[in-house]
Regions:
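Short secondary-structure capping/junction motifs at helix and strand boundaries
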Residues: 37-39, 63, 84-88
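A structural signal for short, well-ordered beta-strand segments and their strand-loop junctions
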Residues: 40-44, 64-66, 91
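Short acidic, glycine/serine/threonine-rich loops at helix termini
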Residues: 51-56, 75-77, 101-103
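Acidic, His- and aromatic-enriched active-site or binding-groove loops in soluble protein domains
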Residues: 60-76, 80
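Long, compositionally biased stretches enriched for glycine and/or charged residues
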Residues: 78-185
Length: 185
């Protein structure tokens, strides 16, 4: 798989894991001594690599979580031009594979309108990978289209480069984010 974000899979994720696993193992060793029944909530990338390593190498209970969960519903509504106040939502999943199971505003189920707006031409290119998964599975995935395309091999295939254009997957997403972040600083 191509590593568009740079900290998940492939060579970027492997090297980031090699730097981060030893530090996280130290934390887990301390937890084994001080609070052996505690649950570690890991928000650190590479999520899958770290969570798996800690589960295999320690006795600490570890769950991988993604920060996208907290902003998923609000960002989805804002992107589609829906009011984002008074939202109630329910998400289930682990690591970078959370799913927005329910979303409502003032008691009204927003999924029918979200599905309708996701198909509008003006929303083409905004979040095509996630919209495709929503069409196929019925739910919106919490992680960005770029990250999701790293985990789901349907979207980027060496023998089907037209998928990159079809789903408008930016292969330079991580460098673009870094430049924007540096400029903001």
């Amino acid at each position: 798989a191509l590593d568009r974000i740079g900290d998940t899979l492939g060579i970027g994720g492997i090297f980031r894991g090699l730097r981060t696993i030893p530090v996280m193992l130290e934390y887990c060793r301390m937890m084994e001594k001080v609070c052996p029944d505690a649950l570690m909530l890991n928000y650190t990338n590479p999520m899958g690599i770290l969570t798996g390593a800690l589960q295999r190498a320690t006795n600490v209970r570890v769950v991988g979580l993604c920060h996208s969960v907290q902003v998923c519903a609000t960002n989805l509504c804002m992107m589609l031009g829906l009011p984002s106040d008074n939202l109630k939502w329910q998400i289930a999943g682990i690591n970078h594979q959370g799913w927005l199971l329910r979303i409502s505003r003032n008691g009204e189920d927003l999924y029918p309108e979200i599905r309708r707006r996701a198909q509008l031409p003006e929303n083409r290119g905004k979040d095509d990978v996630r919209f495709e998964l929503m069409k196929r599975f019925g739910y919106y995935v919490t992680e960005s289209s770029e990250h999701t395309s790293e985990y789901v091999p349907w979207f980027i295939k060496a023998k089907a480069p037209e998928l990159i254009d079809r789903f408008q997957i930016p292969l330079d997403e991580y460098p673009r984010r870094c430049v924007a972040q540096i400029e903001a600083w």
